[in-house]
Amino acid sequence: SAITTSDAGAGIGYTTLRIRGTDGTRINVTANGIPINDAESHTVFWVNLPDFASSVKDLQVQRGAGTSTNGAGAFGGSINMQTGDFSLKPYAEINASYGSFNTHKETVKVGTGLINEHWSFDVRLSNISSDGYIDRASVGLNSYYAQGGYYNDNTSVKLITFGGKERTYHAWNYASKDQMAVFGRRFNSCRIHVYWRIKAEGYINRRLITDYGGQKKPIKADQNGGTFHFYDDQTDNYVQKNYHLLVNHTFTPQWRLNAGLHYTTGDGYYQEYKIGRKLVEYGMKPYEVSGENVTKSDLVRKKAMDNWFGGGIFSVSYTNDRLNASLGGGLNRYDGDHFGKVLWVKNYLGQLNPD
């Protein structure tokens, strides 16, 4: 069995996949034999591959313990996606769809067909957007896919590039039963400038609200959430670009070679409003407000990262009436950096350290 979930509740944006109860860190995912799993966390961030399915011709799922072509063990399963082959004739497609919560997708695909009996080129552009089922859980995704190839009777060489850009509002806190009892199933506490305490009976006993330059003040409970304030730029932003060079060659009817080179870059950040954080956690000293020493404060932080992942894989196979044998290998390298900034601290009078 396979289960998918999404933070926004509409199947768009940050999504997860489980196979037989196993999470994505134990599921190996490849595209044309190239590893797709994040090299650092070993999960797959599907949000960085918007509408990739529109360029996939075949998808194979192997459940349970096994191995995949990237060499790492998979306890939950393996998924291999094969992208589309070249088209013999030129074509152009425009597809659009619309659904609940202002969810829509637009896709444009064009291809040259076979040129001079050996060359072919294809391009896809996609846009996906949704307001989300969860409050304020909007999603904006853009993606591209392009491939060019040379083909003859025994050899094919294909260069593929694809990538995506995502901007998603945070919706990963989820609502507790007490919160849903007061504010409904679609309540989203991310980006909230509010402290609250909810009694077991399921109503608000006290809420304190704060805003830029303001003071915390007790306010009347509003079950519709109209008195809540939110940090508007609490978003996740990421751009990923992938490059694959694939070579297939048939030496004889029995011997065949498959090889590939790959390179992936990623760059992104997210910002969030944090309430009552210790200043020492961010390398800042306490400060005084009206004669009182302040060691905790509300702040806005920005967490960023950039990374690259590259390598190569190969396999040689031999097949006859009695034997199927293959030998392969791969070599990969990953380099990533995490860094951050404090963008704003409530009532802070000193100089903010940029890092």
Task: Identify what each model region corresponds to.
Residues S1-P35, D51, K57:
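Extracytoplasmic beta-strand/coil segments of soluble accessory domains associated
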Residues T15, G77, P90-A92, H104-V108, ...:
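Hydrophobic, lipid-facing positions within transmembrane beta-strands of outer-membrane proteins
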Residues G24, I36, G84, G99-F101, ...:
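Structural signature of outer-membrane beta-barrel domains
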Residues P35-R63, Q82, Q179-A181, R185-S189:
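Short acidic/polar hinge/loop motifs at secondary-structure boundaries
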Residues D51-N95, K105:
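A beta-strand signature from Gram-negative outer-membrane beta-barrel systems
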Residues S156-L246, Y270-K302:
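Acidic/polar loop-and-plug regions of large Gram-negative outer-membrane beta-barrel proteins
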Residues Y238-D355:
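Face-selective signature of the C-terminal outer-membrane beta-barrel domain
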